[in-house]
Amino acid sequence: DLGYAYLPLKEKVLGFIDVPGHEKFLANMLAGLGGVHYAMLIVAADEGIAAQTKEHLAILRQLQFTEIMVVITKADRATNEQIEALKTQIQTDYPFLAESHYFITSAQTGLGIDALRDYLANLPELAEINKPFRYAIDRVFRVKGAGTVVTGTAFAGSVSIDDELFLSTGQKVRVKNIHAQNTPSEKGLAGQRLA
């Protein structure tokens, strides 16, 4: 129910979590936000704000995200006047977004994509790497020959291959392999998607 994507950059890999918009998946949306410091509100220029968007914004505001960026997509499907009206509507209806960074983009024409990528690449990392390791598991499955695999987001700390960890039940487990941001790794860090 959660979508994941990664953007490799020169010095780091950005991870994206696409949370479901439908209200019946609200619990999944909340699970996807664990360990996340920045949010992007994605609004299609030709569709505007959906009912679920209002609910998600209320949650993001309550969770006190460091920053909520507004990305208006599909700019090629709307006039400049429609885009400006949408931006004004967002700022009027959600005053806490008035000072947010706004990006007008189009995947078809490439408009605004480089500016958004550059902005994201320069955001400060806020991961709590120097704290004890905490990991929110969102999926568990078995792989023949590998054993139990868990996926989730690291909230704090770091983990390495052969580390021994404790589950919330008190059961001790050992880390055999790590995939960080969908890539094999020796170590996983706070803020990363890990398996």
Q: Where in the sequence are the language-model features?
A:
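Alpha-helical scaffold elements adjacent to nucleotide-binding pockets in ATP/GTP-utilizing enzyme cores
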Residues: 28, 52-59, 85-93, 115-120
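Conserved Switch II/interswitch segment of TRAFAC-class P-loop GTPases
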Residues: 12-14, 19-24, 34-57, 61-84
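Alpha-helix C-cap/termination motif
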Residues: 32, 63, 93-97
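Conserved alpha-helical scaffold flanking the Walker A/P-loop in AAA+ ATPase domains
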Residues: 3, 28-30
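Conserved catalytic-core segments of large NTP-driven translation/proteostasis enzymes
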Residues: 75, 92-195
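Switch I (effector-binding) loop of TRAFAC-class P-loop GTPase G-domains
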Residues: 1-10
